[in-house]
Amino acid sequence: IVVDNLEDDITLSAALYSANVNPKAHLLAYFKDEALSQLLNQHCPNAECIPAVGAEMLAKAAVDPGSSALHQELLASTRGMTQYSTTYPESASATDVQSIFVYIKRAYQATLIAIDTGKGIELNPDLEKVILPGTKLFYIADERIERIDWSKI
């Protein structure tokens, strides 16, 4: 369920209603006001709130020229390299970041950029970090990898 309205209060109301009707749905809500994102997360911890990032992107581009083009490239879903996610299978054995990083780079020309073990996203994790089954993996690739052969790690 995607909720995006010009008025944040309407977005909040629609998101709360949607979560009440279908609590297991993947709920995305776009807010200009980060305080309302936090309020929705208090009532709906599974909601994914997308903040407005225009000011942050301007500041980043001022300090690191070209950053805005990089961010646009990563967000574009119709061209070039884009960010995707997958879950390390429950049936797989524990491994480490280095093994997954090297494997998906060689086999799929993808780059592992972050993991989420359930405690929040960790960007650029240490190569020695243990990856347990169920860990969410974030990567950059030209297209989504539909079937990763985890047995070849």
Predicted feature locations:
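Cytosolic regulatory regions of ion transport systems
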Residues: I1-I153
